[in-house]
Every structure is written in structure tokens, then in C-alpha cells.
């Protein structure tokens, strides 16, 4: 019997039903001329009989599969395949493909494809009416010159039905007419050929004239289904649909990755590494002289840069320039510099390391005028020295705008250049009679994103605005907006002009100054950005206007409700309505909101490619990876897996919250490989077997007994050296521990982990030194992080009566690595409730296991500690044991009143996890934790640090000041 796989197709179908979309049911009745399909390459009858056929439906990114659809049995059922396809609200792809495959024991191959147009199908046939479509064979042959042409091999018969999941009694024909009418209205609501196409056809960039003249820069109407990789053309002479032709990828085009996804962008830092002085003369292999071929690795947050290496030099001079972005939550991060010695044969050696806080660079940047909101520029951008006629003949090019802009930013913006010489700490083994004073010299500037955007407006006004005597008229502003593809009505611009001219002028002139024109464009930016924010927070009908308080940007649009032309207003306002960025030709402006679109245009135009050597090294994700040789990276790729941020591999990446650096979690190589083979291997299903469970339990208990023995004291010093632990925080000297376990759950000195905001009980603090992922609701945690197929809140809490209180609530997962301080504390003020211990297994809590099909949290041994808090309600803290964790010891009793950061217990040797559950709508986590969690990367925090706060319904939450408050 045919079936549809419950994978991506089922998820897409479920999502479509949830969003209230209509469902198109495609029923394939028959495929005639089956014998021709069966007469493939194999001539052996046994091979023919062993082959099976399946059919796949492709529609955009939607996929559905029906298996075992063809059979030589005469008693097979009439309907051989049934597919349910959610119809989009806006039609961007009109054709879906039915692919017929043949699968044998050793291989599978495509038999043919049928291309069905949705609108043509619904218009030409009635529901439950059978129609036939040809199945076209794909071209055979690897080389294009030797390929045989496609030909028809058989026909398939199908019929269709449209149904509404919310209205079972609705008629299919009525629903089809309503959907076609809606598609027609959506296609005509926004004119794709706006004035921007005329402007773009006049632009000329070297080697890309044909790409710019294409109308593909005009954004298509919004659609809930992503664009397909292929397109279907219809022959005009035969009226039949032809197979899609694969579009060629554009090559050798510059790609700008700056400013793509970070809408909360503070600005950019322009960094120039000048030189390094007084490096140590390390001996070469033959001890005949020194060997030093240094290069510098610079890291900021998730950006890694690397200079060239200079041969045999103790005072290298680089003069290499870099540019990186600074987000709103990265203003207190450190710039980390690492000097590395390049070796031809062996591994590269670390020489020295240092850091510099980026806040010092930000403080020296240009300051905004508090009254006007504008940044000061030394030279105002003037209009070109040519008349109107010559301007019409010689239209300014995109390259000229970019050159003028990038040069003007460096000259005009009043930003101080910081020149710093910082000391570096040697991290190599050396034996010198006199200490080496290694120093690094660099220059840095910070450009606020708002200043770049305002400078971009000035350049656009100068090129397109027709500035006369320092003033710009309404027609000039209309031209600028048309160039950007904006659909903002002229009446809205007229009212802003009237308001600005009445404030600063006595007459009622139709022109304003350039500064006022920049203010006008900034208001429009606030308008469209506020519109996007409201759309994401409260869904509403397109025609309804959003309520806004006094002084909000939407106040500009509300005053047009009663105007005469309000009926002509578009349902959504666009300041930038382009498909691709006309500068880098790569970034899809139509796929992002208006704030990100304006940020990208301003930053893309501001970059002077001649002054910047590199923008972003996407191949590096950490300092250690940038230091490795090619063969080390190749070995790690094969053995450990991908090292990208968010990937499920043996290389665990975490972001240090204090410095912002991406760090590789230190772990023995055999442990990495063992966990990867055990939980991510080919036969990882055997991990659920009783034998494996017994082995893990036995090893855990034996390891706990071993480290409780006095002989285990000898393991303490190698453990400290391997993980480079800071023993100055420990309350007891190393010689005072009698066993390794005593050292493992060591206490720290008082004051080593201060509680954030000690007088504010509404602040949520971290329960342990750990790597944290936090989600606003548990459903998001199962989407991004917890991949256990059987994970539920009820199973995690042992099916207790309290489980229903936390369904739909918030969750914080704090993972403790072996090198962490292994005592856990209370994150809130409250009273300890009845404690429950649940026996279970001893699986590892490494992210590789958590993000597998195995329900680690629901299977492992754990302790439930409820806390009744006046601020956060019922809070459930779950202490989860793990592989090699001997036991979980509690130091608190039931009924005890605890304050934030009070100790609750500790784990013996091994990794472990503390899960904190909150009731719905009680807690809001800090934004940096939520962002990292959505990108599947853990954040390294210390016990007592702020991680969130109580939701106050009377005032908005403020999760953006945690970094300043913690520092």
C-alpha cells in the first residue's frame, strides 16, 4: 500500500494545516504502458521482479513520497499514490513535479517526470475528474554532447480534490475558485515593474551589465513556499509543458556577508594590525639558530581573522586591515590577538596571546546629535557639478556611488582613530635569562551603523535628489524612493515635508535642507521597521492599522486613514523593494525585513574593497581551528565531523559570555571518538540495548569507586594541567584533598561567584558554572536542541502530578563539563518542596547524545527539586546524572528557605546537567542566550550570573542590559 513518509512532508503538511491553508489532494489512479517502464536495462526476469517503483512529488521545498506504486499483479488497487500538498497564499511556483523512480537491490534510477501546472489543472478539469499527463524520460548520457533527447515513455492518470481542514463540508470546486481568485488578486496587488527597473537598467558595473539590466532585481510577491531551483517553460506551439532547465549559478561575483542577519547592529570596527615586536628567538630543530615565522590570529565573537606569515622575523610588520561587525550584545566583548609560529612540517606553535576590550574603540566613535538624531560630518555631500540634462544622459553608476560613499565615510565622519600598543603574554615554553616584553601594535576605528546609513542617504540624495543650493525638493525625494523600489505613497512624504518645512522655515516651500531630507528618510526607516516588528508580535489583517502610542513611528501612517487616497495605500509599506542587492548582486533583499534590508544596503555600499584585505573568514570558527595545519583540519573533519557552529559533531563549540570568543571544549581524543561512534555511528541504535546499558552502569559505578579511593589523589595534578584550571579560586590547597572526588566537587572561596543583583529577587541567576541553552517554550527546545523522539515534560518529571504545570513553559539546560565547578545552586528565592529521586540509565549528556533520537534526559538517573518562589511561582530543578557520574549528593533538605546562589548539592566525577523548568509566561531569558540557543550553540556562564528576569505584565522586559550589569 502506498504511503507518505512522516518526515519533512508531514511536518510541512502539519504546518500548513495549522496556518489555515487549503490542501490539494493529488490522487494518481494509473500509469499506463507499465511494460515499457519494466523493460529497463536489466534483461533478467529475476531482476525485473525484484525491482520496485516509488513516486516522489516535488513542489518548491515540499517533498512527499509514495512507495511500491507499481506492480504486475492484476489485483492491485486503483489509486496507486495519494499526495496532500498545502497550497500557498501567494503563488510563486505554479508547477509541481511527479517523479517516477525504479529501485532495485543495488541501485535506483529515475524513470521519468511529469510536470503539472496547478492553475491549469484547476481551470481545465473538475474535482474527481481524471486527466492524463505524459511522463518524460530524463536525458541519458553524462556529456551534454552525447546526451539523447528526452522522450515520452508513458502516461499517468490523476485527479484532484481541494479540502479545507477547518471546514470539512466545503465544496472542492468552490474552494478552487476562491483560491484562484485570491492568487489573481495577490499577483496584481503589487506591480513588479516599478520605477526601480528603469533606474537599474541604467546602472553599469564592470562585467555585470547584463545581470543588472535583468528584471530579476524586482522582488516577486510574497509566498509561503521558497522559490524552486528550476523553472518550467511551456511551449507555445504545442501547448505542452516542457521539463525545467537548471539555472546556472553566477560565478566570480563578490559576496558581501556583512550585515546580513544581524538587525541589532551597532556598527563596524575597522582594524589594522601593524606589527609585533620582540618575539622570542625559539631554537630550530638542529639548535643552530632561531626559528620564528609568525602570523597573527584575531578573534572577535564569531569572527576569526588571520594575517599572512612572515619568514624568520622577530619583529614582523603586517599592515593588514580587517573589518567586522559589532552587535548590540557584543559591545563588551574582547578583541583577542594570538601570535602563532608557522611550521612547515609540525603543528603550528602558540607564541603569545593578548586581548583588548572593544568598548574603548566604540567610545571614541562619532557621537549623535541628541536633538536631530544626526551624526556630524566634516564635509557635506554636495550635488554633482553637472546640469540636469547631462545628468539624464549620464546616469550615476552603482560603482560610483559605492566609491564616493566608502571614501566619504573615512574622510567625513568625525571618528577618532585609536592607536594602541598592547602587551602580549607568552604561552610557549622558553628559557631566557631576561624576560621578553612582546607587544602588538594596531589601529582601530568604529563606524556606527546609523551614521553609515545617514551617509548612504546623503550620497543617494546627491546622486538622484537634484540638490539645488543645499535644498532638495519633493521630486528629488520621489526619485530617491523610486530608485530603492519603495511603495511609500507620495502623500506620506508630502506631509513629512510640510512638517519639517513649517518647523524650520517661515515660508511654505516645497524644498527642505539635506539634513532635513536625511531626517525624512530616517523617519521612513523607523516606520517600516516598526511595521515589521508589529507584524511579528501581533498578527493582524493587512488592512488594519496598528495602534501606537504617542511618538511612535506609526503615528505617521495613522494620520492617513481618513485621507482621500487611503484606499490606494498598499497593505504593506516597503522602503527598499529589491530582489537582490545591486552592489554585491548576491544578498536576497526580498527575503529579509526592511530593517535588515536598509542595514545591508548601507553597509554594502560603505565598504571600500581596496582598503580592506578581508571581511570575514568563514572557514574558521575558533582560534584553535585557525591555528591548525591543513592535514590537522582534514583529520578532524574525517574523525570528528563538521566543525561549523551548530553542527552535531565531536567538536563541541561554546561561546564564552564574558569575552565573546568561540571556544572548543577541551576533551581527550579517545573520548570524542568514542562518544561519536557510540551515539552518532552507523549502528547507534544498539545503544538502547540492555547489554550497553549494563556496561555503562557498571563502568560508572566502578569509576566512582575508583575516584573515592585515596590512590586517586595522583590524578589531581594531571587533571589540573590538562584543563588549565584556576586554583586561586579553590578554598583548599591541592595537597589538602584526600581523594580525587573531593577535589572534583571542590568548594570555592567566598566571593568567587557573586550573585548578580543581590537586592533584586526578580533577576534569575545561573545555577552552576555551565554551558547554557535556554528557550522561551519547551516546544522550541525540542525543535532546536533536544532531539529525543520520546522526550516529554511528563517523562522528564517521572509522570508526576506537577508535570502539567510546566507544559508550554520555559526551559534552561545547564550542562556541566568535567572541568567545571560541580556544585549547583538555587537560581531563585523560595522554599524547597518534596524531593524525588528517579533511577535510570547513565548516558552521556554531551550535545551529540542530546541531539540524537535517544531521550537522554528522560532515561538518565535524576533528582527532582521543586522550589516554590514568590517571584517565579513553581520552579522545578532537575539534576540529571550522566556517564561516569558516581552520584548526586544534596546538601539541602525539604522545607528549607533558600536564597539565590545558595548551594543545593553537588555531582561526583563526570559530566552532568541541571535542567530548570518554569511555568508559562513567568520568565524571560536574556537575548544573547536565546540567540545562541537558536543557532544551536551553548553559552559559557558562571554560577550567579544573570540569565533572565521575571516577566512583569505592567512594564516591558529589558533583557539587553545584562552584559553591562554583569561587568
Curated annotation (Swiss-Prot):
The record's remark on the cofactor is: Binds 1 pyruvoyl group covalently per subunit.
Which keywords belong to this entry? Calcium, Cytoplasm, Decarboxylase, Endosome, Golgi apparatus, Lipid biosynthesis, Lipid metabolism, Lyase, Membrane, Metal-binding, Phospholipid biosynthesis, Phospholipid metabolism, Pyruvate, Zymogen
Name where it mostly resides. Answer: Golgi
- Bias type Low complexity, positions: 220-237, 532-544
Enzyme Commission numbers on file: 4.1.1.65
Matching InterPro entries: C2_dom, C2_domain_sf, PS_Dcarbxylase, PSD-B, PSD_type2_pro
Subcellular location per the Swiss-Prot or TrEMBL entry? Golgi apparatus membrane; Endosome membrane; Cytoplasm
> C2 domain location, by residue?
250-373
Report the coiled-coil segments: none
Question: Quick check: keyword Ubl conjugation in the entry?
Answer: no
A Gene Ontology MF term for this entry? phosphatidylserine decarboxylase activity
What Gene3D superfamilies does the record point to?
Answer: C2 domain
Residues found modified as Pyruvic acid (Ser)? 912
Give the span(s) annotated as Disordered: 217-255, 532-566, 947-967
Question: What biological-process terms (Gene Ontology) are attached?
Answer: phosphatidylcholine biosynthetic process; phosphatidylethanolamine biosynthetic process; protein autoprocessing
Which metal ions or organic cofactors does this protein require, according to UniProt?
Answer: pyruvate; Ca(2+)
* UniProt-annotated catalytic positions: 769, 825, 912
Q: Which SMART domains match?
A: C2
Q: Where is the composition biased (Polar residues)?
A: 545-558
Give Gene Ontology CC terms. cell division site; cytosol; endosome membrane; fungal-type vacuole membrane; Golgi membrane; Golgi stack
Concerning PTM, the database record says:
Is synthesized initially as an inactive proenzyme. Formation of the active enzyme involves a self-maturation process in which the active site pyruvoyl group is generated from an internal serine residue via an autocatalytic post-translational modification. Two non-identical subunits are generated from the proenzyme in this reaction, and the pyruvate is formed at the N-terminus of the alpha chain, which is derived from the carboxyl end of the proenzyme.
Q: What quaternary arrangement does the UniProt entry report?
A: Heterodimer of a large membrane-associated beta subunit and a small pyruvoyl-containing alpha subunit.
Q: What does this protein do?
A: Catalyzes the formation of phosphatidylethanolamine (PtdEtn) from phosphatidylserine (PtdSer). Plays a central role in phospholipid metabolism and in the interorganelle trafficking of phosphatidylserine. Together with psd1 and psd2, responsible for the majority of phosphatidylethanolamine synthesis.
Give the domain section of the comments. The C2 domains have an essential, but non-catalytic function. They may facilitate interactions with other proteins and are required for lipid transport function.
Q: What is this protein called?
A: Phosphatidylserine decarboxylase proenzyme 3
What's the source species for this entry? Schizosaccharomyces pombe (strain 972 / ATCC 24843) (Fission yeast)
Amino acid at each position: 500500500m502506498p504511503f507518505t513518509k512522516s518526515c519533512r512532508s508531514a511536518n510541512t503538511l502539519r504546518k500548513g494545516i495549522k496556518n489555515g491553508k487549503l490542501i490539494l489532494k493529488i490522487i494518481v489512479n494509473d500509469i499506463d504502458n507499465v511494460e515499457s517502464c519494466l523493460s529497463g536495462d536489466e534483461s533478467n526476469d529475476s531482476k525485473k521482479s525484484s525491482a520496485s517503483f516509488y513516486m516522489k512529488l516535488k513542489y518548491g521545498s515540499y517533498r512527499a513520497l509514495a512507495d511500491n506504486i507499481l506492480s504486475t499483479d492484476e489485483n492491485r488497487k486503483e489509486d496507486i499514490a495519494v499526495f496532500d500538498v498545502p497550497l500557498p497564499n501567494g503563488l510563486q511556483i505554479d508547477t509541481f513535479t511527479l517523479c517516477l523512480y525504479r529501485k532495485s537491490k543495488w541501485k535506483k534510477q529515475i524513470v521519468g517526470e511529469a510536470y503539472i501546472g496547478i492553475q491549469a489543472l484547476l481551470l481545465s478539469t473538475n474535482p474527481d475528474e481524471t486527466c492524463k499527463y505524459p511522463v518524460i524520460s530524463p536525458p541519458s548520457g553524462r556529456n551534454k554532447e552525447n546526451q539523447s533527447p528526452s522522450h515520452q515513455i508513458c502516461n499517468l492518470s490523476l485527479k484532484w480534490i481541494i479540502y479545507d481542514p477547518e471546514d470539512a463540508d466545503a465544496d472542492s470546486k468552490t474552494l478552487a475558485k476562491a483560491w484562484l481568485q485570491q492568487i489573481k488578486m495577490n499577483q496584481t496587488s503589487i506591480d513588479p515593474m516599478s520605477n526601480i527597473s528603469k533606474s537599474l537598467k541604467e546602472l553599469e558595473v564592470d562585467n555585470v551589465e547584463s545581470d543588472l539590466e535583468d528584471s530579476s532585481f524586482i522582488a516577486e510577491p510574497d509566498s509561503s513556499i521558497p522559490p524552486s531551483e528550476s523553472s518550467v517553460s511551456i511551449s507555445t506551439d504545442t501547448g505542452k509543458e516542457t521539463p525545467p532547465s537548471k539555472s546556472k549559478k553566477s560565478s566570480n561575483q563578490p559576496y558581501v556577508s556583512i550585515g546580513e542577519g544581524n538587525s541589532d547592529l551597532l556598527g563596524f570596527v575597522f582594524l589594522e594590525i601593524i606589527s609585533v615586536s620582540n618575539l622570542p628567538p625559539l631554537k630550530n630543530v638542529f639548535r643552530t639558530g632561531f626559528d620564528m615565522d609568525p602570523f597573527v590570529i584575531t578573534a572577535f565573537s564569531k569572527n576569526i581573522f588571520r594575517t599572512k606569515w612572515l619568514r624568520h622575523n622577530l619583529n614582523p610588520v603586517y599592515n593588514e586591515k580587517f573589518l567586522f561587525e559589532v552587535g548590540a550584545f557584543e559591545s563588551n566583548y574582547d578583541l583577542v590577538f594570538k601570535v602563532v609560529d608557522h611550521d612547515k612540517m609540525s603543528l603550528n606553535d602558540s607564541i603569545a596571546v593578548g586581548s583588548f576590550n572593544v568598548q574603548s574603540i566604540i567610545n571614541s566613535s562619532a557621537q549623535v546629535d541628541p536633538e536631530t538624531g544626526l551624526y556630524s560630518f566634516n564635509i557635506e555631500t554636495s550635488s554633482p557639478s553637472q546640469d540636469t540634462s547631462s545628468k539624464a544622459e549620464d546616469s550615476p553608476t552603482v560603482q560610483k556611488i559605492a566609491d564616493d560613499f566608502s571614501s566619504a565615510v573615512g574622510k567625513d565622519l568625525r571618528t577618532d582613530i585609536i592607536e594602541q600598543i598592547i602587551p602580549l603574554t607568552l604561552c610557549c615554553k622558553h628559557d631566557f635569562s631576561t624576560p621578553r616584553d612582546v607587544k602588538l601594535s594596531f589601529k582601530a576605528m568604529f563606524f556606527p551603523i546609523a551614521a553609515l546609513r545617514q551617509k548612504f542617504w546623503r550620497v543617494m540624495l546627491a546622486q538622484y535628489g537634484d540638490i539645488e543650493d543645499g535644498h532638495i525638493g519633493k521630486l528629488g525625494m520621489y526619485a530617491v524612493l523610486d530608485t530603492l523600489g519603495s511603495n511609500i505613497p507620495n502623500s506620506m512624504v508630502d506631509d513629512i515635508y510640510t512638517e519639517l518645512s513649517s518647523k524650520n522655515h517661515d515660508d511654505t516651500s516645497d524644498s527642505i535642507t539635506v539634513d532635513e531630507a536625511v531626517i525624512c528618510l530616517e523617519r521612513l526607516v523607523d516606520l517600516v521597521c516598526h511595521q515589521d516588528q508589529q507584524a511579528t508580535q501581533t498578527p493582524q489583517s493587512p488592512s488594519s492599522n496598528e495602534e501606537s502610542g504617542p511618538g511612535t513611528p506609526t503615528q505617521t501612517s495613522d494620520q492617513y486613514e481618513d485621507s482621500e487616497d487611503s484606499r490606494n495605500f498598499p497593505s504593506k509599506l516597503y522602503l527598499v523593494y529589491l530582489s537582490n542587492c545591486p552592489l554585491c548582486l548576491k544578498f536576497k533583499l526580498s527575503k529579509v525585513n526592511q530593517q535588515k534590508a536598509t542595514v545591508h544596503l548601507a553597509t554594502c555600499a560603505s565598504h571600500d574593497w581596496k582598503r580592506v584585505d578581508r571581511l570575514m573568514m568563514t572557514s574558521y570558527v575558533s582560534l584553535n581551528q585557525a591555528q591548525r595545519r591543513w592535514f590537522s583540519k582534514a583529520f578532524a573533519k574525517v574523525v570528528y565531523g563538521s566543525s561549523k557552529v551548530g553542527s552535531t559533531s565531536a567538536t563541541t563549540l561554546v561561546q564564552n559570555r564574558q569575552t565573546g570568543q568561540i571556544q572548543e571544549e577541551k576533551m581527550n581524543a579517545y573520548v570524542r571518538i568514542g562518544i561519536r561512534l557510540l551515539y552518532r555511528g552507523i549502528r547507534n541504535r544498539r545503544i538502547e540495548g540492555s547489554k550497553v546499558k549494563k556496561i555503562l552502569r557498571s563502568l560508572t559505578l566502578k569509576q566512582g569507586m575508583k575516584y573515592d579511593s585515596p590512590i586517586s589523589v595522583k590524578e589531581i595534578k594531571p587533571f589540573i594541567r590538562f584543563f588549565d584550571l584556576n586554583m586561586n579560586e579553590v578554598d583548599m590547597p591541592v595537597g589538602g584533598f584526600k581523594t580525587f572526588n573531593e577535589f572534583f566537587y571542590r568548594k570555592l572561596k567566598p566571593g568567587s561567584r557573586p550573585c548578580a543583583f543581590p537586592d533584586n529577587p526578580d533577576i534569575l541567576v545561573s545555577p552552576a558554572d555551565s554551558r547554557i541553552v535556554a528557550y522561551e517554550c519547551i516546544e522550541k527546545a525540542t525543535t532546536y536542541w533536544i532531539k529525543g523522539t520520546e522526550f516529554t515534560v511528563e517523562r522528564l518529571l517521572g509522570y508526576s502530578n506537577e508535570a502539567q504545570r510546566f507544559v508550554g513553559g520555559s526551559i534552561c539546560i545547564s550542562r556541566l563539563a568535567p572541568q567545571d565547578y560541580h556544585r549547583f545552586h538555587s537560581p531563585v528565592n523560595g522554599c524547597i518542596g518534596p524531593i524525588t529521586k528517579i533511577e535510570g540509565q547513565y548516558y552521556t549528556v554531551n550535545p551529540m547524545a542530546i541531539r540524537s533520537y535517544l531521550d537522554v534526559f528522560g532515561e538518565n538517573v535524576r533528582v527532582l527539586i521543586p522550589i516554590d518562589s514568590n517571584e517565579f511561582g513553581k520552579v522545578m530543578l532537575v539534576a540529571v546524572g550522566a556517564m561516569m557520574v558516581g552520584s548526586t549528593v544534596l546538601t539541602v533538605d525539604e522545607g528549607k528557605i533558600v536564597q539565590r546562589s545558595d548551594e543545593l548539592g553537588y555531582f561526583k566525577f563526570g559530566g552532568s546537567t541541571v535542567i530548570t523548568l518554569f511555568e508559562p509566561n513567568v520568565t524571560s531569558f536574556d537575548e544573547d542566550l536565546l540567540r545562541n540557543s537558536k543557532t544551536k550553540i551553548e553559552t559559557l556562564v558562571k554560577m550567579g550570573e544573570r540569565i533572565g528576569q521575571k516577566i512583569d505584565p505592567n512594564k516591558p522586559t529589558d533583557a539587553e542590559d545584562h552584559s553591562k550589569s554583569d561587568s
